Amino acid sequence: MARVRESTFALVSYVDRVSIDHDSAVPPYRQLAAILREMIASGELAPGATVPPIKRLRAEYGVAETTARKAVALLRDEGLVETVNGWGSFVRKG
């Protein structure tokens, strides 16, 4: 449970500074992935931390569930996060 709280606080502190530009030529899922990628790079989402759940990403950034899932999948494909079925997605360690 501590992991969820840790990443939730990070999301709340970061969401005040960024948002999704729905008029941009960059697809929303790529914008959201960039936001999460920056949170990982800056340490706001530390190795082992839980990536905010899809429902939380939807609510905070005003995106569709599919958009949030594609953003997390992109980070998984890049090797930045790993998903454990039934547990969620976590920032990869090392």
Stretches with model-predicted labels:
Residues 1-66, 70-73, 77-82, 87, ...:
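Extreme N-terminal segment that seeds HTH/winged-HTH DNA-binding domains in transcriptional regulators
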